[in-house]
Amino acid sequence: MGYYSLTEITAVQYAKDHGYFEEKANVICHEIGDGNLNYVFKLDDGEKSIIIKQALPYAKVVGESWPLSIKRATIESKALQIFAQYVPDYVPVVYSHDEELAITVIEDLSRLTITRKGLIDGEEYPLLSQHIGRFLAHVLFYTSDFGLQSEEKRILEGTFVNPDLCKITEDLVFTDPFGHYDTNDYEPDLQLVVDELWSDKTLKLKVAQYKYKFLTRKETLIHGDLHTGSIFSSPSETKVIDPEFATYGPFGFDIGQFIANLLLNALSREEEKRSVLFFHIEKTWSYFVETFTKLWIGEGVEAYTKEKQWLPIILQNIFTDAVGFAGCELIRRTIGLAHVADLDEIENKETRIQAKKQALSLGKELIKYESKSADIQLFRTLFQQTVSRGVKA
């Protein structure tokens, strides 16, 4: 039959045909996806529920003029299963994957809330940073040369060649926001600030270096799109979803993206409500370092993990990269193709424009920063300096 796009009706029939519901069951189906690339259906018969996710052969956010390979669905399914080997508590269960139709059937997480929405609504999620720090440490360690024999790592790396979605990252994170490209999207009130950013040759040179790291450093399996919209949370649970951008890349990439999205939320808040975001930023790094260090000492397979002086160098390199990648993410989420609700939903125009100017300024500071130590307080310090400079709308 070949590939076809599901509807709510055909999604129900697919689920029944594959044994998830009895043929006579009264299954309610809704398309609930709010992402840019896929259909997501929730199916519920009153006793159990599942999620059916289908990759489209184009970017939904743009349309059929932007074709994409549906093989990304297989990459996403494989990534979730790899993550589950190391941190099963932090990912949804994958029930099945249909490569021909680019369909993945997964656990329904509707008991939880998308973390971005929860943070916008003022939720604090006390375990978020602990869970994400440990998730990152386990996945990044165990899929790298430190946790895998080199032969195994090369084989695994070959299964995560993801050209279409890597090209999206290359363009939308590292290239387009830093020049005159049609994909960019921002208010006219930002034009002077954007022009200044685009003319900053020092900034562009640093961005070029971070892009080159993304292109060439195949260090570990990264989620590739770890923002707060790719995480479900509750006060007691955290689940990482949507790793369709998964590929082998730099250790610091996911860390930087996650931190950047916490910073974007902090920029949307009044000063007295920001402390929980910096708590999560700082605790994410401390839990990552603590867990990564234990794995390095106890389970490192690379011979030189026995050299005590090497780990601090590795952690410093990861931190330096995370800082720069966070800066790139701040800028692309402010003036690039895919914005975030944290800033866009600020109702007062003057406040919204000021927050976006501050995001651009902070992004530039992070990209240019020459990190000499893995001091996680850096994010708080640069944030406060940026805000106190009084970037005016």
From Swiss-Prot:
Which Pfam families does the protein's record reference? APH (PF01636)
One of the record's GO molecular function terms: ATP binding
Q: Which reaction does it catalyse?
A: 5-(methylsulfanyl)-D-ribose + ATP = 5-(methylsulfanyl)-alpha-D-ribose 1-phosphate + ADP + H(+)
Presence of keyword Nucleotide-binding? yes
Q: Which GO terms describe its biological process?
A: L-methionine salvage from methylthioadenosine
- InterPro entries according to UniProt: Aminoglycoside_PTrfase, Kinase-like_dom_sf, Methylthioribose_kinase
Q: In which pathway does it act?
A: Amino-acid biosynthesis; L-methionine biosynthesis via salvage pathway; S-methyl-5-thio-alpha-D-ribose 1-phosphate from S-methyl-5'-thioadenosine (hydrolase route): step 2/2
Q: Mind listing the UniProt keywords for this protein, alphabetically?
A: Amino-acid biosynthesis, ATP-binding, Kinase, Methionine biosynthesis, Nucleotide-binding, Transferase
Which residues does ATP bind? Answer: 38, 53, 107-109, 242-244
Might you give the EC number(s) for this enzyme?
Answer: 2.7.1.100
Record-annotated disulphide pairs: none
Kindly list the positions annotated as binding substrate: 225, 332
The record's family statement is: Belongs to the methylthioribose kinase family.
Please describe what this protein does.
Catalyzes the phosphorylation of methylthioribose into methylthioribose-1-phosphate.
Q: How does it assemble?
A: Homodimer.
Which NCBIfam families does the record match to this protein?
MTRK
> Would you tell me the protein name for this molecule?
Methylthioribose kinase
